[in-house]
Amino acid sequence: MLWIENGRLINPATNYDKNVNILIDEGKISKITQKTLDETKNEEENCRNKEVKIIDAKGCIVAPGLVDVHVHFRDPGLTYKEDIETGAKAALKGGFTSVVLMANTKPTVDNEETLAYVLEKGAKTDLHVHTCAAVTKGLSGKEMVDMDMLLAKGAVGFTDDGIPIMDEELLETAMKKAAELGVPVSLHEEDASLITNNGVNRGKASEHYGIGGSPREAEISLIERDLEVALRTGAILNVQHISSKEGVELVRQAKKRSDKGNIHAEATPHHFTLNEEAVIKHGTLAKMNPPLREEADRLAIIEGLKDGTIDIIATDHAPHSAEEKAKPITEAPSGIIGLETALSLGITNLVHTGELTVSELL
């Protein structure tokens, strides 16, 4: 048995916030109390003769495990970057107990076999590993997957993350189907036709490197389109990793128009912590899609978190090898890790600054 004493227990789902003691028996919470261990033993017959490990949590917060709905564990196919086992260890170190993997592996999670591989390997870890399936076969944007089958086999949502779905007719069909099934569709909002070099904001950062970069219009245009499709179809939409102030405002207005509450949006720790100055300073280590933008965008994202426009913090944990990140800025892949640092970044940049309470962050 485990006895956690003197901790501050926070449960955001119920707005619970008290200093209490917690008794855990066989891996499950048996009792939450302000009584002492001896008093609790006298009340609980099943724990009188059991050995009890005691953890003094004075000055610490005890909370439910964190959930990250947007991670890349690179497994199968790209395991020199990360695999499900190492990704799970990183998640647990960061306080996460559940994650949702993206489908852009090799092969893509668009079939029963790959889905089963991911779920079976995830089940061998100490983490709750869930996964999305792709919206389109091979992330091609051309042919829909069998959503019914993949959902029945364990997928928890659908996304072509990493690649936008440019065919609006196909997207609308997919979102109608997802609405029928009651599952979310998560969309990567960057129109590649408007981007000269991804991962670097068109502005001060792109000028520093003498390249074309990625303009905010690439994100704005697709967020605007996809919100309209979601409102028409009634689908549950998750707008992934917002980077622009205009994108935040579009989501804010769409939420006001949604009578079902099906519009959701996520922000990453790097987008509420950093701006394009980090790309100038750190180069490829701060290169990600969508890119870090201006300070005004970072502040707008924080405002979106404060007023509930952005209702998800997701890491977009996306590891690469050191060799890949050592390439020139126009050749290095976009992506940054985040599972081990997300909570501390939230506490430092949102809680300690007075933007959110600990409960709101969690």
Feature roles, as predicted:
Residues 57-122:
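Metal-associated gating/positioning segment near the N- to mid-region
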Residues 7, 22, 27, 59, ...:
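Divalent metal-coordination and catalytic microenvironments
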Residues 208-236, 285, 306, 312-313, ...:
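His/Asp/Glu-enriched, well-ordered alpha-helical/loop segment
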Residues 106, 161-246, 267, 312, ...:
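Divalent metal-binding pocket/active-site signature
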Residues 85-109, 125-137, 151-166, 182-186, ...:
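Divalent metal-dependent hydrolysis catalytic cores, especially in the metallo-beta-lactamase
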Residues 1-46:
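N-terminal metal-binding scaffold of metallo-dependent hydrolase/deaminase domains
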